[in-house]
Amino acid sequence: MKPSILEKLQQLGDRLEEVTHLLGQPEATSDMDNYRKLTREHAELTPVVEVFQNYRLAQSDLADAEEMLSDPEMKDFAAEEIEAAKAKIGELDTELQKLLLPKDADDDKNIFIEIRAGTGGDEAALFAGDLLRMYSRYAERNRWQVEIVSANESELGGYKEVIARIVGLGAYSRLKFESGGHRVQRVPATESQGRIHTSACTVAVMPEADELEDIELNPADLRIDTFRASGAGGQHINKTDSAVRITHLPTGMVVECQDGRSQHANKAQAMKVLAARLNDAQKREAQAKEAAERKSLIGSGDRSERIRTYNYPQGRVTDHRINLTLHKLDFVMDGDLAEITDALIAEHQAELLAAMGD
């Protein structure tokens, strides 16, 4: 391990002692904001320091085993202990480097997930519905809540576009690599000849902004229109102009919201989605620049990139960024995404570790 990393770990250990001392003071709770800040810092530092303590213990075990090598009667035993200690040190070294990786400030946030049908017409819209169900089932597995923010339904039951809000700790950290092009290969229900069709959808995952106050939205930059909410096929489903469309004039971004119970609720939700989109655009620009510098495939923020194919006849799912193929399509479409998300996170961490070593 690099001396600079060892020094950093020692500093973190010293800081944990200091934070523990501060939290133990009688007046610690007099300033609740500072108390919460210290509690959060304590929770972040503790796992790092504990692993570092195990690392130093393994180093001590290695030194003891190396001393035993000089004793002929203990030589074989010492060799086994040395091998075990070196393996343990290697594992802990990797774990420590992962713990020291820079944290994404958005990882714990709720998300907006936007699914748009692309090429493939009605079949693409049906696939958009399948993707929404997949992410909803995954959210259920993680005990997250799913709210439909806006939906433009197709006549056959799918979605031309749908935006959902997923509420739960770590939602963004687990789903942020889902952004991009998703392709499906299957025989549509409307296909009489049994031919396989290829359709596509685009998924965008955006962290929810903490507060609208954090986003600079000049009222002069917004055009707000109201209209009647409509259901599938375009029929009006109420008699008041409760649906809201907000256009951000500088960027041309348009957000529509009509699923709320009132115009006020729809406007508030649309503003949240707009704030998330603007944040996301800035984030993707920074990610693209960073990814170009280190030739990253994961987390590049490129929405035009085809990231995954769902092949129904073969029952397989392939993530093209990491060359991962799983022959468990039914399980994946039912929300069993852990194997895919874990692999993507691991690959992203490997890229960050490689960058640390440069």
Curated annotation (Swiss-Prot):
Domain of life of the source: Bacteria
Residues that bear N5-methylglutamine: Q235
Show the GO MF annotations. translation release factor activity, codon specific
How is the polypeptide modified once translated? Methylated by PrmC. Methylation increases the termination efficiency of RF1.
Keyword annotations of the record: Cytoplasm, Methylation, Protein biosynthesis
- Is Nucleotide-binding among this UniProt entry's keywords? no
Q: Which GO terms describe its cellular component?
A: cytoplasm
Q: Where in the cell is it found?
A: Cytoplasm
A Pfam family reported for this protein in Swiss-Prot or TrEMBL: PCRF
The record's section on SUPFAM superfamilies has: Release factor
Role played: Peptide chain release factor 1 directs the termination of translation in response to the peptide chain termination codons UAG and UAA.
Q: Its family?
A: Belongs to the prokaryotic/mitochondrial release factor family.
Q: What is this protein called?
A: Peptide chain release factor 1
